[in-house]
Amino acid sequence: MCGAHYVAIALLVVAGSLAAAEFDQNEIQQTSDDDVMASVNSTYELLQSRILRERREPKDNLLSAGDEERTPSSPSSFLKELKVSDSIMDAANVIRTEGGASAIDAALKNLNQLNRKRRQRIAPTSKNVAGHEVGTSSDTDKSLVSVENETPFVLAKRRRTKRSAAMMTNAARSAKQHDYRLAPTESSTIPAKAPDDQLNKQPISQKALQLDKNEHVDESLWREELMTVDEVLHLFEEFDKPAHPTAVNLQEPNAIETTSKKLNHLRRNKRKRKHIASTPKNVGQLVRAPPLSDKSPVLVAKGIPFVLAIRLKKNHPTAIMKNAAKFVTQHDYRLTPSGPSMINAATPNSQLKFHLLGQKALHLDKNEHAGDLNEESHTVEHIFHLRERNDKLAQTTAVNQQSVLKNWEAEIANGPLLLSRDRPDKMVKEIHAAFLETFNLPFHQYP
């Protein structure tokens, strides 16, 4: 009996080794005590079938000597459950969890890379809006320019500048308000007949330029070009416009009353020190609009050359500019505005065309400072008094009208005005006397 037990134990060991060799080592995992017992039972069943197969062989005398129906006892009777400590199980669980987390991270990275490559391969689509194709980008990585604080720095980075300029800031503000991207080429506008009732939208670059011209910070960005002769003449015409719309048709029945109301209105606005709005009123004739407030009228001869030099981008006024200023101030007239802007005075003593009341006010401003004017009420008689005063001045300075003859004997005796290097000659004196008698003007004043 002892020998039979020894033989059975030896066969059990051999069968266990053979069964272990047949199992796949990659699929065996010891997770709990139940799995261990399940593996032991499967080993027992395999061993039992192997023993029965060996007992059918005729050469096995040892097994045939005993009872053929006798089988070894169940291994659960002499095998005990393996006790695994909790620390070992916790360590195994941690190792398994870390491995799963690393695998998940790697899978997410691969998925993101695949998504980015797939977005880059997708071609941009186009939409038909009211018969026009409008390109739309499918790249979702590029977000809309809708943040005012970050967009200027992005634009500055693309232009390789250190700080954001005023144009970039205004472009960011326009993008935040309208919330749309730059339209592609050949489809930069959306017609007003679109189904979604969208108005015509210009590109952000054009809107930024328009905003920057109106609200620019650095005025040196917008430089004025050199002016031509026609532009200079137009500039004089702008300066020669009356300061206030005061053209009145004398044939109107209520012209005097309307004029007094206008003057009282101007006097009240002057006391309040407010800007007079350029609201034209139709009183028989069209009223010319006043010039812009930033363009001060050229009233002083010394200031005209410097104004022209600044407008023509010159450091100092030239001789032509000085002569033009001298010509304007000596003859005391301004460019006559075109159209029905003159008042024909139907008086028997004078047939001259009088200037506008605004030009008369400018003439007074040449002689008296605006702050020193008397603020008493301007009546109609005062207006006609100013007109008569201007008539007298116009008669003495009119070029196209012959003045009253004057005795030039003293001028003839003194002779013409000569330079220090010139010497008076008899012929020069004769020419001087002839000019005085013929043109009724001194020789040195003849144009």
UniProtKB/Swiss-Prot annotation:
One of its GO terms (cellular component) is host cell nucleus. Coiled coil: none annotated. This is Secreted RxLR effector protein 115. Glycans are attached at N41. Belongs to the RxLR effector family. Its main location: secreted. Secreted effector that dos not suppress the host cell death induced by cell death-inducing proteins. Residues 57-78, 122-143, 171-198 are annotated as: Disordered. The lineage of its organism: Eukaryota, Sar, Stramenopiles, Oomycota, Peronosporales. The keyword Glycoprotein applies. Residues 1-19 form the signal peptide. It is found in: Secreted; Host nucleus; Host cytoplasm. The RxLR-dEER motif acts to carry the protein into the host cell cytoplasm through binding to cell surface phosphatidylinositol-3-phosphate. Transmembrane segments: none annotated. Keywords: Glycoprotein, Host cytoplasm, Host nucleus, Secreted, Signal, Virulence. A motif (RxLR-dEER) lies at residues 50-70.
